[in-house]
Every structure is written in C-alpha cells, then in structure tokens.
Amino acid sequence: MTSSYMRLKAAAIAFGVIVATAAVPSPASGREHDGGYAALIRRASYGVPHITADDFGSLGFGVGYVQAEDNICVIAESVVTANGERSRWFGATGPDDADVRTTSSTQAIDDRVAERLLEGPRDGVRAPCDDVRDQMRGFVAGYNHFLRRTGVHRLTDPACRGKAWVRPLSEIDLWRTSWDSMVRAGSGALLDGIVAATPPTAAGPASAPEAPDAAAIAAALDGTSAGIGSNAYGLGAQATVNGSGMVLANPHFPWQGAERFYRMHLKVPGRYDVEGAALIGDPIIEIGHNRTVAWSHTVSTARRFVWHRLSLVPGDPTSYYVDGRPERMRARTVTVQTGSGPVSRTFHDTRYGPVAVVPGTFDWTPATAYAITDVNAGNNRAFDGWLRMGQAKDVRALKAVLDRHQFLPWVNVIAADARGEALYGDHSVVPRVTGALAAACIPAPFQPLYASSGQAVLDGSRSDCALGADPDAAVPGILGPASLPVRFRDDYVTNSNDSHWLASPAAPLEGFPRILGNERTPRSLRTRLGLDQIQQRLAGTDGLPGKGFTTARLWQVMFGNRMHGAELVRDDLVALCRRQPTATASNGAIVDLTAACTALSRFDERADLDSRGAHLFTEFLAGGIRFADTFEVTDPVRTPAPFWNTTDPRVRTALADACNGSPASPSTRSVGDIHTDSRGERRIPIHGGRGEAGTFNVITNPLVPGVGYPQVVHGTSFVMAVELGPHGPSGRQILTYAQSTNPNSPWYADQTVLYSRKGWDTIKYTEAQIAADPNLRVYRVAQRGR
C-alpha cells in the first residue's frame, strides 16, 4: 500500500470514518471503545444508504450521520423552528409564518411538551420503548459527529454554511420536531387561530352565529392537509401474476423542506431489516418493506381534533361553566425573540385544550368561546409503532401492531404480504366521537356541520360530553380498534385520500362514526381513476399485455399519466366550443376559443412530457367539472358520468379563463416545455398533473402567467412498487426530488432526471442485490463512548 493511502486511512480513522475497499467489515469491527457507536454504511446507486449496526443506538447513529451528510441544512432549520427560534433567524413575517410558528413552538417548550412525552402517558400504552430511545440518541450522536468533524464553516451546502443557527443537536430537539409532525393535521393547522385568540373587547362581536356555515369553516380549516396527499395499492394473490402480495406506495408530499422523504435500508441483524423511506430527520422507516410484508400510507379523511363550545361567565370572558360551576382559563404569556426585538403573545388554556378562533364562525364573544382537543398532542407512540411494523411477518401481525399502538397520526395503512393477503385500515388517531356522543353532545346548530364535514363541536359546559375512553384504545380520548375500518382481501385494497368507504369496492366499509369520513358519497376523480386502473389491469383492457400485475406493469400503470377528468368530459367540451367558438371570461374579455378547441381535440388525455393541451385542460378544471348526471351509490367508480349541462354559462367562462391564463399557444406547448423543476441553472421537464384533474401521478406546480409551471411545490415523491416473492422482495423505487438538498451533492438531481424519463432504481434488499450494485461505496462510522 502507498504511504499516501495509509495517511488517508489514518485521517479517516481519526475522524471516525473508515472506508472499506475490499471485504465488508462487520459494523462493530475495530470498535474503538466498548459502549460506543459503530455503523456500517454501504452507499448504493443514487446515494441510497444501506446501514447495518449491532444495536438500535448504533443504527440511529448511522442514520443521523448519513442524513446530515445529505440534508444537514434541512434538519438544522427544522430544529430552529421546533425550538421557537424561527423568527430570530428567519424574520417575523413571510411565507413561513415565522412569527406564528415561533410563538407556538415557544409555548410548547414552556409547557415541556416533549419532556412530558418522554415521561409516557399516565394511562395507556407505555412509550417510547428503549429501542426507540436508543435510536433517537444515536441519531443525535451521528448528526453531531458529522457536524463536529466537518465544521459549520466547511459545510458544502451554501444554504447553511457558516450560519449561526446550525449547531449540535440534543435529544430533546429531535423529539420536538417529532411532536410538530404529530400535530400537523390538528392544532398545527390551527396555529393562526390559537395565536389570534384574545378575550373580547367592546368592539368585538357580541355573539357567535347560531348556525355556522359549513363551507366557510371548511375553507378556514383547509390547511389541515394542505400540501400532502397520496395513492396506494395493496395487491393480493388474485391481482398479481405470481400470486404474491404487492404494494404501490405513492405519497404526495412537499418537494422542499422537512417533509421531504429520504430513502434508506436499515438493519440490526436478527432484529430489524427494513428498506424504504422516512421523512428527513426521522430515524426509522415509515413507508417500506421487510422480507415478507410491505406497507404504505395515505392521508386519512378522519378529523384530528374536536371543538368544545364554552359558555362563559357573564362579565368574565376568561371563565367558563362546567356542570354549572365556573372554571378559569389559564393565561400564559410567551415572549419570543425576533430579528427586530421581542414579541409577546398570551395564550388561554382550558381543561379541553387551547382556545382558538375562526373569525366570523368560531369567535370569542362575551358569551361564548371555543377550545380544541388535539388527540395527537400526546402521541409519543409513532416511532414505536413504525419500528414494530417493520418487524411484522405478515399483514395480520401488522394489524396487531396497529391495534396495540394506535400511533398513526393522520394516515391510513395499505399493505400486502408474501402470502398474497392485502390490508386496508384507517388506524389513525381519531377523537372518540361515537354516534351516541354526537347525538347527545353536539348542539343542534352544529349538527349539520358534523353531518356534512365530520367537524365535531361538543358542548363544553357538560363534563359528560368529554371524549371519554374506549376499553380497547391505546390511550383515553380516541376511538379504539373495534371502531375503526379495516379490510383484509386477496384481490386488492386501495386509497387515494377519500374516506375508508371504497377501499375495496367489492366490500365497502360502512357504518362507522362520521368523524372518520363520509360513506356512500361521490369519490374524487383521482380515486375513481385509481380504481379504474386496477379493474382494467385485472381485465386486461388497459392496452398493456396480459392480465394482472407484475412490478413492471404496476410501474407502467403508476406513470401512465392518465387525466381522468379529460377522459370523461373532453369530447363534450370540444363539441361545445366548436358550436360556440367565443366566450366571455370572468374579467369581461371576449375570448376566441378556436385555437383552444383545436388543441383540446388533439389532446391525448394524458400528462406525459409530449402531451399538448394538458395545461389548458388543467386550468379549465380550476373552474370545476359540472356533471348534470347524478351519483349512483351502486356504481361509484363510473358516476357521476360525463353528461354536461351545456347551457351552464360557467363552462364556457371557465374555458375562456383558461385561455387567458395559458402560458402560450395551447397548440404548440407540451407538458415537457412548460412543466419543469429547477436544479441550479438546469430546468428538468416534469410529467404528471393536478389531482383535481383526475391525474394519479400528482404534480402540483403553480402557473406563472406567461411562463408556465417552473417549480414543483408538492406531489409524487417516494414511489415504491414492490413484490414479496418466495426469494425475497423485488421491484422498483424512485425519490423524485433525489436524496440531497445540497446543490453540491452528486445526489442532488440524479433521481429527478431519472423520474423525468420514467426510469427507476431497482430495489436492493438482499446481500446479493446490494453487492451487485455497480456504484457501491462502503464505509464505517464510529464514535468512542455514548
């Protein structure tokens, strides 16, 4: 060996990184000191790390190290937010709502929320377990090890190089970011309303509306799931060519920030061996597979919080009655540091939770206020649950994990196993609003709101209207497993963010509490397309060879980019604009529809890179498809059918508006010309389309008039098509925005380019599959002491 190589190896050992050039060492080989951390990292193509360790602490160490290598700026920024320091470093105003987020995070710190989560619940399932605690500590140590040996000023990512807000992590930092994720769809979506809640003044409203407008409330609460969605298939033996279980995972998540996924394969020999993806900053696989079972998640329609209407004490708007006795709210003033000085806000808490407002609907008046109970606020079970899911051998064992831990904060589960059995379940954390409680405790003016939306407003003046406890629930206040919708099938289950009702069209799930979602109602265009794709594939009528699914056929279906809205109404729309070639836009302009009509007549009803006219149809649909036909509960996949009320003037107005907003001539621009994503100076063509248009492969990239759609905001992110065959799992994966946010990383844009051409990375799970990777790089990270 050359002396230069020996010097390089010595330097690597000094930094705690050993590069293996030949035989792969065991994770603990050459461990510097008993009780330290050591992990073996094998980087495969596209930077995907396969991490092996002897225990969960060292596994977390490896995860923290590689995630810091690839995304240290994202993790550091999320920690700043969770610690109530966002306003200080990023300003008090702007698109991040830094002031609101900082104030809320500071309140959570003052309340010792994360510390109390680590103490575990007073009653219910004990969590987090020792393995998870070890893994979190290890993650922190691995992140800090990378930062210490690299140095803030030598980071290669310009987004945080040399920034004062990049610092070593503590264990509590990581638990705070986890808590932020738990409450995302509950109190996290109501931050504005919680921060804005102040006692009434003489100038405020005297009373709240007696009959709240359900549509107005829905609009005000629209942020509860903004920016996230998903599709998933669980295919059983009757749906696959080989009779094995198969899963398609297709979460739709933001392309920037802490909610990006990160691909990895984690292994503690004999205890845990799971490949898939997790959100950046999380130490455990959240969507993925082991040798015999695979799973994905889709965003559930169930509600995560309930309102309590408070009857206030006359003359004292910060006191309320419970069973005829007054109780005082607890006022807490929180002061945060911003770039321009300190800012103070006062929060008001009740026995139910914080007071919140939705102006014009849920106002704080001299007589009435509203408090919320977020049932995820005490959810410390998530990482325990995902860890145990990864150890399940089949979908029945997986369901047992879900039943015991009830940890999923706001998602369904769709799974399949090597025996060919598929599972759907909404095992998410849901407030315990049973039919009996709703009937007895939702005041009459709020009953229509609950029936239409599942938003429950309970009578806060009665203690018997509290959420109570189910005997089989993991913790009090949530629906137990016996009240949740579950379906096992040997053909298929699916979900695309509608409710549980049609997870299996052959066996609809009905009779569940309204708070979980609606039943026997029209499904979204994306749900209908997802079901139609499966049914056509099983019948062999989709234009692809044969019948049934292989992973190759599943990939083709996933990226077929059908636009179901266009399939249903394009011909009628073309006929209409040919009969009436001019229309008045909503701004009063008279628009010639001739060119648009020609483009739509040639549109292939897909969102492929070479599809022309897709953007025009997408903008038209922003005005809403209007069916004259009715929904048939016995035919939910195909109704409402495409029968238009062509006399409705809004149809032609919507088309005129689409023409006005079109980035250029609809007859000359393809999806690949105008749907792009930036990677430095490079603009990568992006296929896919809006979910509202009935596109399965969702890509949301806002229109910039005169330019096109230059930046993806959210959509298809991690995609997995995996088959659980007799020789182990096989299939395809991709992470659309790539592993790293660092523009100087080799893994900054490689998978985005791969996605653009509908390519894939082959799943590598077995030792033989990993060893065969042509780009494999092996190294070990270690640290003395813990």
UniProtKB/Swiss-Prot annotation:
<feature type="active site" description="Nucleophile">
    <location>
        <position position="230"/>
    </location>
</feature>
<feature type="compositionally biased region" description="Basic and acidic residues">
    <location>
        <begin position="672"/>
        <end position="684"/>
    </location>
</feature>
<dbReference type="InterPro" id="IPR023343">
    <property type="entry name" value="Penicillin_amidase_dom1"/>
</dbReference>
<keyword id="KW-0732">Signal</keyword>
<keyword id="KW-0964">Secreted</keyword>
<feature type="propeptide" description="Spacer peptide">
    <location>
        <begin position="215"/>
        <end position="229"/>
    </location>
</feature>
<comment type="similarity">
    <text>Belongs to the peptidase S45 family.</text>
</comment>
<keyword id="KW-0865">Zymogen</keyword>
<dbReference type="Pfam" id="PF01804">
    <property type="entry name" value="Penicil_amidase"/>
</dbReference>
<feature type="signal peptide">
    <location>
        <begin position="1"/>
        <end position="22"/>
    </location>
</feature>
<feature type="region of interest" description="Disordered">
    <location>
        <begin position="658"/>
        <end position="689"/>
    </location>
</feature>
<protein>
    <recommendedName>
        <fullName>Aculeacin-A acylase</fullName>
        <ecNumber>3.5.1.-</ecNumber>
    </recommendedName>
</protein>
<feature type="propeptide">
    <location>
        <begin position="23"/>
        <end position="34"/>
    </location>
</feature>
<dbReference type="InterPro" id="IPR043147">
    <property type="entry name" value="Penicillin_amidase_A-knob"/>
</dbReference>
<dbReference type="GO" id="GO:0005576">
    <property type="term" value="C:extracellular region"/>
</dbReference>
<dbReference type="InterPro" id="IPR002692">
    <property type="entry name" value="S45"/>
</dbReference>
<dbReference type="InterPro" id="IPR043146">
    <property type="entry name" value="Penicillin_amidase_N_B-knob"/>
</dbReference>
<keyword id="KW-0378">Hydrolase</keyword>
<dbReference type="GO" id="GO:0017000">
    <property type="term" value="P:antibiotic biosynthetic process"/>
</dbReference>
<comment type="function">
    <text>Catalyzes the hydrolysis of the palmitoyl moiety of the antifungal antibiotic, aculeacin-A, giving a hexapeptide moiety and a long chain fatty acid.</text>
</comment>
<dbReference type="InterPro" id="IPR029055">
    <property type="entry name" value="Ntn_hydrolases_N"/>
</dbReference>
<comment type="subunit">
    <text>Heterodimer of a small subunit and a large subunit processed from the same precursor.</text>
</comment>
<feature type="region of interest" description="Substrate-binding">
    <location>
        <begin position="35"/>
        <end position="130"/>
    </location>
</feature>
<feature type="region of interest" description="Possible recognition-sequence of an AAC processing enzyme">
    <location>
        <begin position="220"/>
        <end position="239"/>
    </location>
</feature>
<dbReference type="GO" id="GO:0016811">
    <property type="term" value="F:hydrolase activity, acting on carbon-nitrogen (but not peptide) bonds, in linear amides"/>
</dbReference>
